[in-house]
Amino acid sequence: MYSSLNIYNQPVTLAPTTVASPNAAYQRMANFWGLVEDLKEGTYKIRSEHRKYLNQEPRETDDAYDTRLARSTVVPYLQRIEKMLSGMLVRKPIRLDDVSDLVREQLFDVDLEGNDLNVWLYQTARVAISFGHVGVLVDAPKDGEKARPYWVTYAPKDILGWRTEIIDGVRKLTQLRLMEQVVESDGKYGEKIVKQIRVLEPGRYEIHRKNNKGEYKLHDEGEMSI
C-alpha cells in the first residue's frame, strides 16, 4: 500500500560531492520544508498532491476517493499564525535613535527592492516563523560613487551548506554556500532566470552558475573584505 510517510525517511548523504550538494543538516530538514511550503500554498496545492497527504482507503474506489478529495479543504492556520506573529513585530514603527541621516535614508530601501525596514522585517519574520530560521546577508559593493550596503534574505532551502572551525578559541564560520536566482536579459526583449551558487569564505568568494547540462561551473571569483 502507498504510504506518504516514506518521504520523511530519506537517506542523508554525509559527504557533499559538488558545490550544489546540500549538507547533512539541510537534508534532514528538506522534506519537512516541503510540507510547510505545500501548506502555505493552500487547498489546491494539497489536493494536487492527493495521496501524498490524503491516503486512499483499502476498499475505496477511485471515484469515491476523488469525491472525498474534492470535498477536502486545508484551513489556512499556518498563514494566519505566520501573519499574526510577524505583524506583532511591526505593530509600531521601528524607532531609530542615534542614527545618522545617511543610514536613516538607506533604511527606507534596505534591500534595493523598495522595502523599508518595517516591511523587510515583516517579510523576513514570516519566513523565519514558517521554517524555523532565516539567513540575512548584508552586502556592500565597492563599485560606484553611490554604492551602499543592502540586505539580502535567504530562505533555509537556499542555504545549502556551511562550515565552522574553532579559531583562537572561538567558533567561526569558514564557508557558506547560498543558492540564488538572477534575472538576465535574453535577446532584445526577453529575460531568463539563471541559477547560481555563491560560495563565501574569509577574504574571497566564488560564483558557480548552472549550465545547459545542469552542472554548476565556476563563473566568477574574487576577493572581499570579510
Tell where the protein language model's regions lie, with residue ranges.
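Extended, helix-rich architectural segments
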Residues: 1-153, 167
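Structured, contiguous alpha/beta core segments that scaffold functional sites
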Residues: 139-226
